[in-house]
Curated annotation (Swiss-Prot):
Name of the protein this chain belongs to: Large ribosomal subunit protein uL22
GO biological process per UniProt: translation
UniProt organism field: Anaplasma phagocytophilum (strain HZ)
Encoding gene (name): rplV
GO cellular component terms, A-Z: cytosolic large ribosomal subunit
Subunit structure of this chain's protein: Part of the 50S ribosomal subunit.
Length: 112
């Protein structure tokens, strides 16, 4: 059984739905191909997931001595982190709640 290398990004300032759109692009791909997809994707979530992917690659090199050329993205887990709630004043003395959602990402790599 190969070693699963993981990296987490917690409290990322993007909603889980937006993160999941980008995560679908790299699931099951080689690490080099996944990094290229994220580099040319024009979404903010791509930058956030790219940081987590690079962290997982660095973990593989530093902790396990695994070469990045042999790695592929086994799974990308996207979940809810927390929600900041704000109040926006509206007309006639009313107020509305604004929810600023945060997401979390776990990238797991496996050696081929």
């Amino acid at each position: 059984m190969s070693i699963v290398i993981a990296a987490k990004g917690l409290g990322l300032r993007s909603t889980p739905a937006k993160l999941n759109l980008v995560a679908d692009l790299i699931r099951g791909k080689d690490v080099a191909v996944a990094a290229m997809y994220l580099k040319f994707c024009k979404k903010k979530a791509a930058l956030l997931i790219d940081k987590v992917l690079k962290s997982a690659i660095a973990n593989a090199r530093a902790n396990y001595g695994v070469d990045a050329d042999n790695l592929y993205v086994k799974e990308v887990l996207v979940g809810k982190a927390f929600t900041l709630r704000r109040v926006q004043p509206r007309a006639r003395g009313r107020a509305c709640r604004i929810s600023k959602r945060y997401g979390s990402v776990v990238v797991k790599l496996l050696e081929r």
